[in-house]
């Protein structure tokens, strides 16, 4: 019987981790890992932080070159898959070559969402999704530069903190009336907003950009409030567009992302997907959920690798992610939309835990500079328990 061939399209966090997991689980067939970028798989979280701050900081690759050789993973960087042919179990490369697969894993991730109104201003418009993006930003963000960040989500705020630390003057423009609205409870939103403002970041919340123009080297934005903001460069932090067109063209079910089940299987039995490109259907509610985090990419990669081999996947834990801003480590686990939040510790001292509850049940937690406690919280929230009555929330 011939060896099976598993092809992975997308050589980011999820793709590389899936390939590694397949070998860890003793898959002895061929693994082909295809990546569009001209870089081996690398860690992305540092791109908005250490990599920008320290000019000597080198990219952090997920695995060494020797790893791919030793594990017999055929890593093909700088290649693009242009078509999937599910009925023939093959993918077509941009150069016209065809590769046959037994199982296919799609991990193409996402691209930064852009703002056409601002794109017309020229070359001083930046995004941050890739190592190449980070290298461009490294050259642009300098002392006394006026940085306009469009979007007050995690990436926008991390870039605001990093840019300030480099001596830039930073303004954040956010359409919503809060920051990190999709992923943080109100207590954390207010805390982070205060910290950024104390460091000199200017915020325009509940604000839209209605016009933009370039005057010499200056970028001038007019807001719906009538106010004018001027910058030297603009950085987008307005979310992502998911690279699901390849899947949609192949007839897979998509809905603003590739729809997968709890085993990371798509609507085609031999095609799986993992990471930022996915929408996963929750078994209990049937709702489609997207989680664009490092942890989720690793978790889904592991689940997909097991499923491709016909193995029982590991039990998923509660969703977890982190952000570092102003030297403050913030970790979040579970449901950030809980009905009630309780504080243990002192936010003013940058050391506290926020507990989210619904009907007296612990459903989420935020640890601020409390990394050790987060380990216990993650274990606890893997199997949610009734909060003990009588607990005093300090």
UniProtKB/Swiss-Prot annotation:
Q: Which residues cross the membrane?
A: none
Cofactor(s) listed in the protein's UniProt record: FAD
- Asked if the record carries the keyword Flavoprotein, the reply is yes
What EC number(s) does this enzyme carry?
1.18.1.3
Reactions accelerated catalytically: 2 reduced [2Fe-2S]-[ferredoxin] + NAD(+) + H(+) = 2 oxidized [2Fe-2S]-[ferredoxin] + NADH
Q: In which pathway does it act?
A: Aromatic compound metabolism; 3-phenylpropanoate degradation
In which domain of life is the source organism classified?
Answer: Bacteria
Keyword Oxidoreductase appears in the UniProt entry: yes
Keywords of the record, alphabetical order, are:
Aromatic hydrocarbons catabolism, FAD, Flavoprotein, NAD, Oxidoreductase
Please tell me where NAD(+) binds in this chain.
146-174
Residues bound to FAD are 5-36
InterPro entries recorded? FAD-oxidoreductase/Apoptosis, FAD/NAD-bd_sf, FAD/NAD-binding_dom, FAD/NAD-linked_Rdtase_dimer_sf, HcaD, Reductase_C, Ring-hydroxylating_dioxygenase
For this record, an example GO cellular component is: cytoplasm
Q: Give the GO biological process terms.
A: 3-phenylpropionate catabolic process
Q: Which GO terms describe its molecular function?
A: 3-phenylpropionate dioxygenase activity; ferredoxin-NAD+ reductase activity; oxidoreductase activity, acting on NAD(P)H
Q: What class of enzyme is it?
A: oxidoreductase
Q: Give the multimer and partner information.
A: This dioxygenase system consists of four proteins: the two subunits of the hydroxylase component (HcaE and HcaF), a ferredoxin (HcaC) and a ferredoxin reductase (HcaD).
Protein role: Part of the multicomponent 3-phenylpropionate dioxygenase, that converts 3-phenylpropionic acid (PP) and cinnamic acid (CI) into 3-phenylpropionate-dihydrodiol (PP-dihydrodiol) and cinnamic acid-dihydrodiol (CI-dihydrodiol), respectively.
Which family does the similarity line name?
Belongs to the bacterial ring-hydroxylating dioxygenase ferredoxin reductase family.
Q: What is the official name of this protein in its record?
A: 3-phenylpropionate/cinnamic acid dioxygenase ferredoxin--NAD(+) reductase component
Organism (species) = Photorhabdus laumondii subsp. laumondii (strain DSM 15139 / CIP 105565 / TT01) (Photorhabdus luminescens subsp. laumondii)
